[in-house]
Amino acid sequence: MSLAQTLRGALLTDFMGAAWIAVREMFRRKATVNYPFEKNPLSPRFRGEHVLRRYPSGEERCIACKLCEAICPAQAITIEAEPREDGARRTTRYDIDMVKCIYCGFCQEACPVDAIVEGPNFEFATETREELFYDKERLLANGDRWERLIAKNLELDAPYR
């Protein structure tokens, strides 16, 4: 053992260095968030729970082009459509199996009228798998609930689309 190692052990420099690091870290700003009481802000591009949007007049936006169904890599979307009296096509059935969904956002990008959008909600835990099978009514209800925030996020994201 050399003299330097003996002095280092006697003066407890390693211990003092570790104690200094512990004290310094104690007063550093916390990196964690006390979820669910605190939440970090979400990006306008955040992809969460799916929604079907309506026009301001109340009519649903979906024109039953089925592009979202065709582009979905997980095959989580099922659409059935019928023509209306005025000749326009509208969906009679629009289902998303959220268990299959991989939240890639392809359905949102493919939609020509911004009818299907992945909204800001990420807290949609359920007790059964059946509750993760979203039908048209539930998707429209999600759209009605989150419309203001979705419209704002789409406006913020517009320069990049």
Curated annotation (Swiss-Prot):
It is a peripheral membrane protein. Binds 2 [4Fe-4S] clusters per subunit. Its cofactor is [4Fe-4S] cluster. Its main location: membrane. It catalyses: a quinone + NADH + 5 H(+)(in) = a quinol + NAD(+) + 4 H(+)(out). InterPro entries: 4Fe4S_Fe-S-bd, 4Fe4S_Fe_S_CS, NADH_quinone_OxRdtase_chainI. [4Fe-4S] cluster 1 binds at C62, C65, C68, C111. Its EC number is 7.1.1.-. NDH-1 shuttles electrons from NADH, via FMN and iron-sulfur (Fe-S) centers, to quinones in the respiratory chain. The immediate electron acceptor for the enzyme in this species is believed to be ubiquinone. Couples the redox reaction to proton translocation (for every two electrons transferred, four hydrogen ions are translocated across the cytoplasmic membrane), and thus conserves the redox energy in a proton gradient. This is NADH-quinone oxidoreductase subunit I.
